[in-house]
Amino acid sequence: MRLYRDRAVVLRQHKLGEADRIVTLLTRDHGLVRAVAKGVRRTRSKFGARLEPFAHIDAQLHPGRNLDIVTQVVSIDAFATDIVSDYGRYTCACAMLETAERLAGEERAPAPALHGLTVSALRAVADGRRSRDLLLDAYLLRAMGIAGWAPALTECARCATPGPHRAFHVGAGGSVCPHCRPAGSTTPPPGVLDLMSALHDGDWEFAEQTPQSHRNYVSGLVAAHLQWHLERQLKTLPLVERTYHIDRTIADQRATLIGQDMDCG
């Protein structure tokens, strides 16, 4: 089969044999790709350093039966240097990469929107000018939107009645009107769902003026909504929470949201 080229974000890697690695890539045109990078653990490897997690690369690959083979790599953006130098940035970016892999869908299914979103998010994390918790929640909301899992924020998740609505129920799919509100719904403080909408839509001027208490509440809702659809928590999110010193009450609140009953139709 012919060689192919694609832009990719390196999501993760692990050792193979004495000198090789298997890398997991989120490519623009071929989606999730797993490939062998031969000899990259040797000190004289031509492109070993370019295949570290967080790297944005242009790669040439040879299709294989189970795993492709990396034959050439050109660095586009070296985000890793700025990301790994700060633990908070590192844990935030790790959560983004884990989310990207979980939401990419079937291997080799084109994922241009998720690829572009992930590149932009890593660039913003590496830049360090915006709040990491806002960046992460914005990424999670938009990534879920690409996957078709975005929570309803401006209308009722059940009957589509225009909002704003005060109640939120993860199992129902987001905000719910008084008539559709299931048992176990939470009622976020005023402004919380507005912040979620701002993060989803990219209204950073509004988002950056919100109090930390609202941001903490949004983090709980976003993580709960993502966990509901993935059916398990991201391994990296607890590390991010410790970095931001999320209050114990927020963690308890999140557990309550996850425990909402499923009889919401």
Swiss-Prot record:
Keywords in alphabetical order: DNA damage, DNA recombination, DNA repair
Cellular compartments per GO CC: bacterial nucleoid
A single GO BP: double-strand break repair
HAMAP family: RecO
UniProt similarity note: Belongs to the RecO family.
Functional summary from the UniProt entry: Involved in DNA repair and RecF pathway recombination.
Name of the protein in question: DNA repair protein RecO
Organism: Mycolicibacterium paratuberculosis (strain ATCC BAA-968 / K-10) (Mycobacterium paratuberculosis)
